[in-house]
Protein backbone atom coordinates (compact mmCIF):
# COMPACT_ATOMS: atom_id res chain seq x y z
CA UNK A 1 0.00 0.00 0.00
CA UNK A 2 1.56 3.33 -0.93
CA UNK A 3 1.60 6.16 1.50
CA UNK A 4 -0.64 9.11 1.04
CA UNK A 5 0.87 12.54 1.64
CA UNK A 6 -1.25 15.18 3.32
CA UNK A 7 -0.62 18.83 4.00
CA UNK A 8 -2.18 20.63 6.95
CA UNK A 9 -2.00 24.28 7.96
CA UNK A 10 -1.21 24.63 11.72
CA UNK A 11 -2.06 27.56 13.96
CA UNK A 12 1.55 28.89 13.90
CA UNK A 13 1.47 29.13 10.11
CA UNK A 14 3.88 26.26 9.44
CA UNK A 15 3.05 23.48 7.01
CA UNK A 16 3.29 19.94 8.39
CA UNK A 17 3.46 17.11 5.86
CA UNK A 18 2.65 13.60 7.04
CA UNK A 19 2.57 10.21 5.44
CA UNK A 20 -0.06 7.75 6.63
CA UNK A 21 -1.66 4.43 5.87
CA UNK A 22 1.60 2.59 5.27
CA UNK A 23 1.79 -1.22 5.57
CA UNK A 24 5.06 -3.12 5.74
CA UNK A 25 5.55 -6.66 4.43
CA UNK A 26 5.70 -8.16 7.87
CA UNK A 27 2.89 -6.16 9.47
CA UNK A 28 -0.28 -6.04 7.33
CA UNK A 29 -1.93 -3.46 9.54
CA UNK A 30 -1.65 0.16 8.57
CA UNK A 31 0.65 2.39 10.55
CA UNK A 32 0.85 6.17 10.63
CA UNK A 33 4.17 7.83 9.88
CA UNK A 34 4.84 11.14 11.49
CA UNK A 35 8.10 11.77 13.41
CA UNK A 36 11.34 12.44 11.51
CA UNK A 37 12.67 15.76 10.32
CA UNK A 38 15.84 16.64 8.50
CA UNK A 39 17.49 19.94 9.19
CA UNK A 40 18.24 20.43 5.49
CA UNK A 41 15.07 18.92 4.02
CA UNK A 42 13.20 22.01 2.90
CA UNK A 43 14.44 25.33 1.71
CA UNK A 44 11.74 26.95 3.76
CA UNK A 45 12.56 26.64 7.52
CA UNK A 46 8.84 26.82 8.38
CA UNK A 47 8.09 23.54 6.62
CA UNK A 48 8.68 20.45 8.78
CA UNK A 49 8.64 16.87 7.48
CA UNK A 50 8.57 14.15 10.13
CA UNK A 51 8.08 10.35 10.26
CA UNK A 52 6.83 8.25 13.11
CA UNK A 53 5.31 4.78 13.60
CA UNK A 54 2.45 4.49 16.08
CA UNK A 55 3.63 1.20 17.55
CA UNK A 56 7.32 2.09 17.50
CA UNK A 57 8.12 -0.70 15.01
CA UNK A 58 10.56 -0.77 12.12
CA UNK A 59 9.59 1.13 8.96
CA UNK A 60 10.68 -0.16 5.54
CA UNK A 61 11.58 2.35 2.86
CA UNK A 62 12.56 2.18 -0.80
CA UNK A 63 14.83 4.43 -2.89
CA UNK A 64 13.46 5.69 -6.19
CA UNK A 65 14.73 8.19 -8.74
CA UNK A 66 13.11 11.54 -9.47
CA UNK A 67 13.69 13.05 -12.89
CA UNK A 68 13.48 16.75 -13.56
CA UNK A 69 11.61 16.34 -16.86
CA UNK A 70 7.94 15.68 -17.48
CA UNK A 71 6.21 12.63 -18.85
CA UNK A 72 3.35 12.64 -21.30
CA UNK A 73 0.03 13.37 -19.62
CA UNK A 74 1.53 15.06 -16.54
CA UNK A 75 0.48 18.49 -15.38
CA UNK A 76 2.85 21.39 -15.35
CA UNK A 77 4.98 21.69 -12.23
CA UNK A 78 4.85 17.98 -11.41
CA UNK A 79 8.05 15.93 -11.45
CA UNK A 80 8.30 12.47 -12.99
CA UNK A 81 8.99 9.51 -10.73
CA UNK A 82 10.91 6.57 -12.14
CA UNK A 83 12.15 3.37 -10.53
CA UNK A 84 15.64 3.39 -9.13
CA UNK A 85 17.76 0.57 -10.58
CA UNK A 86 17.78 -2.44 -8.28
CA UNK A 87 21.36 -3.33 -9.25
CA UNK A 88 22.72 0.01 -8.09
CA UNK A 89 23.44 0.00 -4.37
CA UNK A 90 22.44 3.10 -2.44
CA UNK A 91 24.08 3.35 0.95
CA UNK A 92 22.23 5.66 3.31
CA UNK A 93 23.45 7.19 6.55
CA UNK A 94 21.17 7.11 9.58
CA UNK A 95 21.47 9.96 12.06
CA UNK A 96 19.91 9.40 15.48
CA UNK A 97 18.57 12.29 17.49
CA UNK A 98 18.40 14.78 14.64
CA UNK A 99 16.01 17.06 16.53
CA UNK A 100 16.16 19.19 19.59
CA UNK A 101 13.29 20.09 21.86
CA UNK A 102 13.14 23.58 20.32
CA UNK A 103 12.56 22.75 16.64
CA UNK A 104 10.80 19.38 16.96
CA UNK A 105 7.28 19.04 15.69
CA UNK A 106 4.57 18.23 18.23
CA UNK A 107 3.30 14.68 17.71
CA UNK A 108 1.14 12.25 19.60
CA UNK A 109 4.12 10.01 20.44
CA UNK A 110 5.87 9.98 23.77
CA UNK A 111 9.04 11.85 24.59
CA UNK A 112 11.04 8.60 24.72
CA UNK A 113 10.64 7.93 20.98
CA UNK A 114 13.83 7.61 18.92
CA UNK A 115 14.02 9.89 15.89
CA UNK A 116 16.04 9.15 12.74
CA UNK A 117 17.04 11.27 9.78
CA UNK A 118 18.12 9.66 6.49
CA UNK A 119 20.79 11.23 4.27
CA UNK A 120 22.37 9.82 1.09
CA UNK A 121 25.93 8.56 1.48
CA UNK A 122 27.21 11.12 -1.00
CA UNK A 123 26.06 13.90 1.29
CA UNK A 124 27.62 12.51 4.47
CA UNK A 125 31.24 12.99 5.36
CA UNK A 126 33.51 10.02 6.00
CA UNK A 127 33.35 8.95 9.66
CA UNK A 128 30.68 11.52 10.57
CA UNK A 129 27.02 10.60 10.46
CA UNK A 130 25.52 13.93 11.44
CA UNK A 131 27.01 16.56 9.09
CA UNK A 132 26.02 17.24 5.49
CA UNK A 133 27.78 19.13 2.76
CA UNK A 134 26.22 22.19 1.25
CA UNK A 135 24.56 21.15 -2.03
CA UNK A 136 21.35 21.56 -3.89
CA UNK A 137 18.32 19.50 -2.95
CA UNK A 138 16.63 17.08 -5.34
CA UNK A 139 12.89 17.22 -4.84
CA UNK A 140 9.77 15.33 -5.85
CA UNK A 141 6.38 16.99 -6.20
CA UNK A 142 3.10 15.26 -5.47
CA UNK A 143 0.52 18.09 -5.51
CA UNK A 144 2.48 20.79 -7.26
CA UNK A 145 5.62 22.78 -7.06
CA UNK A 146 4.45 24.38 -3.81
CA UNK A 147 4.74 21.14 -1.74
CA UNK A 148 8.25 20.13 -2.65
CA UNK A 149 9.90 17.44 -0.58
CA UNK A 150 13.64 17.35 -0.85
CA UNK A 151 16.74 15.66 0.43
CA UNK A 152 20.21 17.16 0.51
CA UNK A 153 21.87 15.39 -2.43
CA UNK A 154 24.11 16.33 -5.36
CA UNK A 155 22.33 17.45 -8.53
CA UNK A 156 21.08 14.61 -10.72
CA UNK A 157 20.96 12.00 -8.01
CA UNK A 158 17.27 12.45 -7.33
CA UNK A 159 16.69 9.80 -4.63
CA UNK A 160 14.25 10.05 -1.78
CA UNK A 161 12.67 7.62 0.65
CA UNK A 162 9.22 6.07 0.35
CA UNK A 163 7.70 4.30 3.36
CA UNK A 164 5.88 1.42 1.70
CA UNK A 165 5.83 -2.34 1.20
CA UNK A 166 8.34 -3.74 -1.31
CA UNK A 167 5.53 -5.57 -3.12
CA UNK A 168 3.48 -2.40 -3.77
CA UNK A 169 3.85 -0.26 -6.91
CA UNK A 170 3.60 3.53 -6.98
CA UNK A 171 0.53 4.77 -8.82
CA UNK A 172 0.75 7.63 -11.31
CA UNK A 173 4.30 6.95 -12.49
CA UNK A 174 6.31 4.54 -14.57
CA UNK A 175 7.06 1.04 -13.35
CA UNK A 176 10.03 0.51 -11.08
CA UNK A 177 12.01 -2.61 -10.30
CA UNK A 178 11.20 -4.27 -6.99
CA UNK A 179 13.77 -6.38 -5.23
CA UNK A 180 12.47 -9.87 -4.41
CA UNK A 181 12.22 -11.20 -0.89
CA UNK A 182 15.51 -12.44 0.50
CA UNK A 183 13.66 -15.24 2.32
CA UNK A 184 10.60 -16.25 0.30
CA UNK A 185 7.76 -17.67 2.28
CA UNK A 186 7.20 -21.35 1.64
CA UNK A 187 4.19 -22.97 3.33
CA UNK A 188 4.92 -26.17 5.18
CA UNK A 189 3.98 -29.25 3.26
CA UNK A 190 1.80 -31.72 5.09
CA UNK A 191 2.43 -34.57 2.62
CA UNK A 192 5.52 -36.04 4.36
CA UNK A 193 3.78 -35.93 7.72
CA UNK A 194 0.70 -37.67 6.28
CA UNK A 195 2.84 -40.34 4.64
CA UNK A 196 4.74 -40.89 7.86
CA UNK A 197 1.50 -41.17 9.84
CA UNK A 198 0.05 -43.65 7.37
CA UNK A 199 3.20 -45.75 7.49
CA UNK A 200 3.17 -45.72 11.29
CA UNK A 201 -0.52 -46.65 11.33
CA UNK A 202 0.10 -49.52 8.90
CA UNK A 203 2.94 -50.85 11.08
CA UNK A 204 0.74 -50.62 14.17
CA UNK A 205 -2.07 -52.50 12.43
CA UNK A 206 0.35 -55.21 11.32
CA UNK A 207 1.66 -55.65 14.87
CA UNK A 208 -1.87 -55.86 16.25
CA UNK A 209 -2.87 -58.41 13.62
CA UNK A 210 0.10 -60.63 14.48
CA UNK A 211 -0.69 -60.38 18.18
CA UNK A 212 -4.31 -61.39 17.60
CA UNK A 213 -3.23 -64.32 15.44
CA UNK A 214 -0.90 -65.57 18.17
CA UNK A 215 -3.65 -65.31 20.80
CA UNK A 216 -6.08 -67.18 18.56
CA UNK A 217 -3.53 -69.94 17.95
CA UNK A 218 -2.92 -70.34 21.70
CA UNK A 219 -6.66 -70.55 22.36
CA UNK A 220 -7.02 -73.21 19.67
CA UNK A 221 -4.20 -75.22 21.28
CA UNK A 222 -5.92 -74.93 24.67
CA UNK A 223 -9.17 -76.16 23.18
CA UNK A 224 -7.32 -79.20 21.84
CA UNK A 225 -5.64 -79.95 25.18
CA UNK A 226 -8.74 -79.62 27.38
CA UNK A 227 -10.84 -82.80 27.21
CA UNK A 228 -14.23 -81.08 27.43
CA UNK A 229 -13.46 -78.67 24.61
CA UNK A 230 -12.03 -81.32 22.32
CA UNK A 231 -15.23 -83.39 22.59
CA UNK A 232 -17.47 -80.50 21.59
CA UNK A 233 -18.28 -79.86 17.97
CA UNK A 234 -16.63 -76.93 16.26
CA UNK A 235 -20.01 -75.88 14.83
CA UNK A 236 -21.28 -75.01 18.29
CA UNK A 237 -19.29 -71.82 18.14
CA UNK A 238 -17.31 -72.20 21.33
CA UNK A 239 -16.28 -68.74 22.45
CA UNK A 240 -12.79 -67.78 23.49
CA UNK A 241 -14.05 -66.89 26.94
CA UNK A 242 -15.64 -70.33 27.35
CA UNK A 243 -12.42 -72.04 26.28
CA UNK A 244 -10.39 -69.98 28.74
CA UNK A 245 -12.89 -70.71 31.54
CA UNK A 246 -12.68 -74.45 30.94
CA UNK A 247 -8.93 -74.19 30.75
CA UNK A 248 -8.89 -72.57 34.20
CA UNK A 249 -11.12 -75.33 35.61
CA UNK A 250 -8.92 -77.99 34.09
CA UNK A 251 -5.82 -76.39 35.56
CA UNK A 252 -7.46 -76.33 39.00
CA UNK A 253 -8.30 -80.03 38.73
CA UNK A 254 -4.75 -80.81 37.69
CA UNK A 255 -3.40 -78.94 40.68
CA UNK A 256 -5.69 -80.82 43.06
CA UNK A 257 -4.70 -84.13 41.51
CA UNK A 258 -1.05 -83.28 41.82
CA UNK A 259 -1.52 -82.39 45.48
CA UNK A 260 -3.33 -85.67 46.14
CA UNK A 261 -0.67 -87.65 44.31
CA UNK A 262 2.06 -85.94 46.26
CA UNK A 263 0.40 -86.96 49.52
CA UNK A 264 0.05 -90.58 48.34
CA UNK A 265 3.65 -90.57 47.28
CA UNK A 266 4.69 -89.53 50.75
CA UNK A 267 2.65 -92.48 52.17
CA UNK A 268 4.32 -94.87 49.78
CA UNK A 269 7.71 -93.63 50.86
CA UNK A 270 6.80 -94.31 54.49
CA UNK A 271 5.59 -97.84 53.63
CA UNK A 272 8.81 -98.47 51.78
CA UNK A 273 10.82 -97.57 54.84
CA UNK A 274 8.69 -99.87 57.02
CA UNK A 275 9.12 -102.69 54.52
CA UNK A 276 12.86 -102.29 54.59
CA UNK A 277 12.86 -102.49 58.37
CA UNK A 278 10.74 -105.66 58.36
CA UNK A 279 12.91 -107.28 55.76
CA UNK A 280 15.95 -106.63 57.92
CA UNK A 281 14.23 -108.18 60.90
CA UNK A 282 13.34 -111.30 58.88
CA UNK A 283 16.93 -111.71 57.85
CA UNK A 284 18.05 -111.48 61.47
CA UNK A 285 15.55 -114.12 62.54
CA UNK A 286 16.67 -116.49 59.79
CA UNK A 287 20.24 -116.16 60.95
CA UNK A 288 19.29 -116.98 64.55
CA UNK A 289 17.32 -120.04 63.39
CA UNK A 290 20.30 -121.43 61.58
CA UNK A 291 22.50 -121.02 64.65
CA UNK A 292 20.01 -122.89 66.81
CA UNK A 293 19.85 -125.79 64.38
CA UNK A 294 23.57 -126.04 64.31
CA UNK A 295 23.72 -126.30 68.09
CA UNK A 296 21.09 -129.04 68.13
CA UNK A 297 23.03 -131.19 65.68
CA UNK A 298 26.14 -130.74 67.71
CA UNK A 299 24.40 -132.27 70.75
CA UNK A 300 22.99 -135.21 68.72
CA UNK A 301 19.47 -134.07 68.45
CA UNK A 302 17.60 -134.39 65.26
CA UNK A 303 15.36 -131.47 64.34
CA UNK A 304 12.19 -132.44 62.54
CA UNK A 305 10.30 -129.65 60.79
CA UNK A 306 6.65 -130.33 60.51
CA UNK A 307 4.50 -128.76 57.95
CA UNK A 308 1.21 -127.52 59.40
CA UNK A 309 -0.46 -127.69 56.06
CA UNK A 310 -0.33 -131.52 56.17
Curated annotation (Swiss-Prot):
Cross-link Glycyl lysine isopeptide (Lys-Gly) (interchain with G-Cter in SUMO2) mapped to chain: 306
PROSITE patterns for the chain: BHLH
Entry GO MF terms: bHLH transcription factor binding; DNA-binding transcription activator activity, RNA polymerase II-specific; DNA-binding transcription factor activity, RNA polymerase II-specific; enzyme binding; histone deacetylase binding; identical protein binding; protein heterodimerization activity; protein homodimerization activity
Pfam families noted in UniProt: HLH
SUPFAM superfamilies, sorted: HLH, helix-loop-helix DNA-binding domain
All copies of domain bHLH, residue ranges: 199-254
Ranges for region Disordered: 1-26, 171-209
Entry's localization field: Nucleus
Broad class of the protein's primary localization: nucleus
Matching CDD domains: bHLHzip_USF1 (cd18924)
Keyword Transcription regulation found: yes
Gene Ontology biological process: carbon catabolite regulation of transcription; cellular response to glucose stimulus; cellular response to insulin stimulus; glucose homeostasis; glucose mediated signaling pathway; glucose metabolic process; late viral transcription; lipid homeostasis
Biased composition (Polar residues): 1-17
GO cellular component: chromatin; Golgi apparatus; nucleoplasm; nucleus; transcription regulator complex
InterPro entries: bHLH_dom, HLH_DNA-bd_sf, USF
Biased composition (Basic and acidic residues): 190-209
Record keywords: DNA-binding, Isopeptide bond, Nucleus, Transcription, Transcription regulation, Ubl conjugation
Region called Leucine-zipper, residue ranges: 271-292
TM region(s), chain numbering: none
Known disease link: Hyperlipidemia, familial combined, 1: A disorder characterized by a variable pattern of elevated levels of serum total cholesterol, triglycerides or both. It is observed in a percentage of individuals with premature coronary heart disease.
Function recorded in the entry: Transcription factor that binds to a symmetrical DNA sequence (E-boxes) (5'-CACGTG-3') that is found in a variety of viral and cellular promoters.
Assembly and binders: Efficient DNA binding requires dimerization with another bHLH protein. Binds DNA as a homodimer or a heterodimer (USF1/USF2). Interacts with varicella-zoster virus IE62 protein.
Name under which the protein is recorded: Upstream stimulatory factor 1
Naturally occurring in which organism (per UniProt): Homo sapiens
Amino acid sequence: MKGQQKTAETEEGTVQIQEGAVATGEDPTSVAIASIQSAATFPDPNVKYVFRTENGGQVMYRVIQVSEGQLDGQTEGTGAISGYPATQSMTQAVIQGAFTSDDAVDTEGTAAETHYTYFPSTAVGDGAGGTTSGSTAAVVTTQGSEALLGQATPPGTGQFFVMMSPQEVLQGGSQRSIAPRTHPYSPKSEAPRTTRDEKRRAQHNEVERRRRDKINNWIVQLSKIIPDCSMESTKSGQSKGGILSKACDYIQELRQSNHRLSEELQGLDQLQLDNDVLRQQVEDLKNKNLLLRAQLRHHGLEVVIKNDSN
